[in-house]
Structure formats: C-alpha cells, structure tokens
Amino acid sequence: MAMGTHFGGLWLALLCMVSATMGAVPRKPVDVPFGRNYVPTWAFDHIKYFNGGSQIQLSLDKYTGTGFQSKGSYLFGHFSMQIKMVPGDSAGTVTAFYLSSQNSEHDEIDFEFLGNRTGQPYILQTNVFTGGKGDREQRIFLWFDPTKEYHSYSVLWNLFLIIFFVDDVPIRVFKNSKDLGVRFPFDQPMKIYSSLWNADDWATRGGLEKTDWSKAPFVASYRSFHVDGCEASVNAKFCDTQGKRWWDQKEFQDLDSFQYRRLRWVRSKYTIYNYCTDRKRYPVMPPECKRDRDI
C-alpha cells in the first residue's frame, strides 16, 4: 500500500504541474479559530483546545465520543476543515464531517472516515441525502496516510452541483438533476457538523472488526475551520441570489476537463464501492449517475 500511495502522489503532482492553472478550484480557505463558527454539542470534556482555539482534538473512549456543530445554518457556499485522523488501530471508529438540515425529510452531505486495523488503510465514505433519501454511498481509499498530516476536506455547494474535495482534488460530484426526477438540496438550510464516535457494528469490514478499547482514547485533530456560505438561519430567501455569489459563477457550475481527469484518476485507482455500479442493489441505474459521470 505504501508503494501505491507513493506513486499516486507522484501522478497527482504531475497532473498539477501540467495543468495547474486550468482547474477552477474554490477560493482559498480562511484559517479561523474554532469558536468563530462552531460550538460543542455533546461530551464537552472530550474536546481539547490548543493555540487559542485554532486547533482542537476530539476524543473517543468506551464511554462516549464527542462532536460539534456550526452556529449558523447555510444555504450554499464553500465549507472546509483540515483533519488529522485517529492514528494506529482505529477499527470501529468513525470520524464524520457533514452538512445536514434539521427535519424528517432532511438533506445531508457526508464525509465519513472509517477506521481500520493498524497498517490497513482508512476508507472514506461519501453520501448525499435529498428529501430524507440517501443510499448513495461511494467509498474510496486515499492516496496518502490521513493520520500523518493534516489534509483539507471540503464541500462546494451551489444551485448546480455539490463537489466533494480532498486537498482540492474533486473526488465526487452530485449534480442538480431535478429535471430527471431526482431531488437536489436547494431550499433547506444546513448546519455543519463533525463528530468522532464508535460504530463498530458496521464501520470496519461490515462490523466484523470491533473497537479495541485498550487502545483508547482515540483522538482526531482539527484546524482551519473555514466557512464561506450564505447564512440562512434567519431568512432563507436572502440566499436565493440567482448567480450573485462567487460560488454561482460559471466556472463553478461544472468541473473543467482537468478536474474531470483528476476525478477519473480517483475513480480508476482508488474507488472501492460506487452505488451507481451496484447492479444487485440497483438493477436499474439511478438516473443521476450518468450525469454525474459516476460510471
């Protein structure tokens, strides 16, 4: 796995050198402290603060995990944070970063990092819920060890699409396919959440690998709590700007050719599960898959 990770990094670097100016990546995140945009939600004593709140650590033990959420709710924008995952034997643990509305027919945009035994790679699972319906899981390996250094995980969300980024590499696109009968998150403001919790009933090898509590506490580290979105906590209609925000501009309404090459690189080398190609689960391919170039 180490050799594959090394060559994966070299290939990505070559792509960047060849076409470094072509990709319309989101604006550079602004490094702000935790307390500017976020508050703890549970198990406050399992969150530690460093450097005036510019860095935090979440801790999981056999009694509880912990988590936090944004102060505001947002309708469209760019949201990111840098995370260093639980090192060592992290089997059974899940570190989650996601956006979600607060109702029964909720919308949700998920990053879930599934821990593994020492020496085995993390799995990144993404999912999109619209109108309370999810079941759009995709899983990838990463081309680096996410426990060694901080890496950026971000979401760009506008009226046209949702893009999941890992260090500015697009790993998934979910386009607005309302014309195909697929609901899209466009009118329910979402809060931003993150949590570290035990999910050993499903997270690692379908629940076969259980959390080894002798390795606790499990610690995930965070920094760079970037939020650049339309805060809709008071008036959602204010955010229906019809193209006036930077994230609505033409260059952010689709990936360009360079970004699609990077997405195909992730698809071909690191994807281990894609609901779009699961014919046992979906004998008829979901209508959004072809538009999202997930096949």
Swiss-Prot record:
One of its GO terms (biological process) is cell wall biogenesis. It catalyses: breaks a beta-(1->4) bond in the backbone of a xyloglucan and transfers the xyloglucanyl segment on to O-4 of the non-reducing terminal glucose residue of an acceptor, which can be a xyloglucan or an oligosaccharide of xyloglucan. Residues 24-222 form the GH16 domain. Keywords: Apoplast, Cell wall, Cell wall biogenesis/degradation, Disulfide bond, Fruit ripening, Glycoprotein, Glycosidase, Glycosyltransferase, Hydrolase, Secreted, Signal, Transferase. Its EC number is 2.4.1.207. Xyloglucan binds at residues 112, 125-127, 135-137, 201-202, 206, 281. GO terms for molecular function: hydrolase activity, hydrolyzing O-glycosyl compounds; xyloglucan:xyloglucosyl transferase activity. CDD domains: GH16_XET (cd02176). Induction: In fruits, expression is greatly decreased by gibberellic acid (GA3) on day 12 of storage and by 1-methylcyclopropene (1-MCP) until day 12 of storage. Expression in fruits is also decreased by low (0 degrees Celsius) temperature treatment throughout the storage. PROSITE patterns: GH16_1, GH16_2. The active site is at 108 (nucleophile), 112 (proton donor). GO terms for cellular component: apoplast. It is an enzyme of class 2 (transferase). Residues 1-23 form the signal peptide. Contains at least one intrachain disulfide bond essential for its enzymatic activity. It is found in: Secreted, Cell wall; Secreted, Extracellular space, Apoplast. Catalyzes xyloglucan endotransglycosylation (XET). Cleaves and religates xyloglucan polymers. Does not catalyze xyloglucan endohydrolysis (XEH). Probably involved in cell wall restructuring during fruit ripening and postharvest fruit softening. Belongs to the glycosyl hydrolase 16 family. XTH group 1 subfamily. This is Xyloglucan endotransglucosylase protein 2. It comes from Diospyros kaki (Kaki persimmon). The gene is XTH2.
